[in-house]
Regions:
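Extracytoplasmic/secreted proteins, especially bacterial periplasmic and envelope-associated proteins
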Residues: 20-23, 27, 31, 42, ...
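Pocket-lining segment of extracytoplasmic ligand-binding domains
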Residues: 116-185
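Short beta-strand elements at the ligand-binding edges of bilobed clamshell
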Residues: 67-96, 196-202
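Conserved acidic residues
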Residues: 34-36, 105, 159, 199
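Beta-alpha junction/loop-to-helix N-cap segments that form part of ligand/metal-binding clefts
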Residues: 11-70, 166-190
Length: 202
């Protein structure tokens, strides 16, 4: 005899487009699915906007309070949303940067300005890096077209670079690496995928 339930899955890829995310989630709700899994911030936000009754699970979400624009955060959403987070221990990463680059003075942070989770990470780790004695400056790009130029600006003015967990940066590691390696500037990444593509550590 078979044990358990027969499950069917409907996997849709919005390719990072917010309007496509909304269309997909509306279809899921219309089809009265039992669960919705939102992978990354845009998908979670679209799912949250589409239903307050179907249970939603989030994954690849750095900070739920930021993603869901919740000012009163107690560790749970208080609604039909739960899930996992990929937020790195930013205080420990700042200490690791100090261990790896003790002689550095200026740290540049590169991230996509349209990703709320990246803004949150940059703001948070900046405080920890300043506590370690670094001068920190943010270098933001709006989309993948600006990545190389922004990386060059960061490399020109920084002794080392930090890149938080950032979807756009993760998809542009080759372009980032091409610039940073030419400039001989080390990159500390917020997560393993970016570290493999263009970083020296995470």
């Amino acid at each position: 005899d078979k044990l358990g339930d027969d499950l069917s899955f409907d996997e849709q890829n919005a390719a990072g487009d917010a309007s496509t995310c909304s269309t997909i989630c509306t279809t899921f709700v219309t089809n009265d699915y039992d669960r919705i899994l939102g992978n990354a911030t845009a998908a979670l936000q679209a799912a949250s906007a589409s239903t307050d009754s179907i249970p939603i699970l989030g994954t690849s979400i750095t900070d739920y309070a930021t993603a869901l624009d919740m000012s009163d955060w107690s560790g749970t959403t208080g609604k039909n949303i739960s899930g996992t987070t990929d937020l790195a221990p930013l205080d420990e990463q700042a200490k690791c940067i100090k261990e790896l680059f003790p002689d550095a003075k200026n740290i540049g942070i590169i991230y996509c300005s349209s990703e709320p989770n990246s803004i949150y990470q940059s703001t948070t780790i900046t405080k920890y890096l300043e506590d370690e004695g670094y001068t920190v400056k943010e270098y933001t790009f709006s989309d993948s077209n600006d990545v190389a130029a922004v990386t060059q600006s960061a490399c020109d003015a920084s002794d080392a670079i930090y890149i938080p967990t950032d979807n756009t940066a993760a998809s542009c590691t080759e372009a980032i690496n091409n610039v940073a390696s030419q400039a001989k500037k080390p990159i500390f990444a917020g997560e393993e995928g970016i570290a493999k593509g263009c970083g020296v550590a995470t």
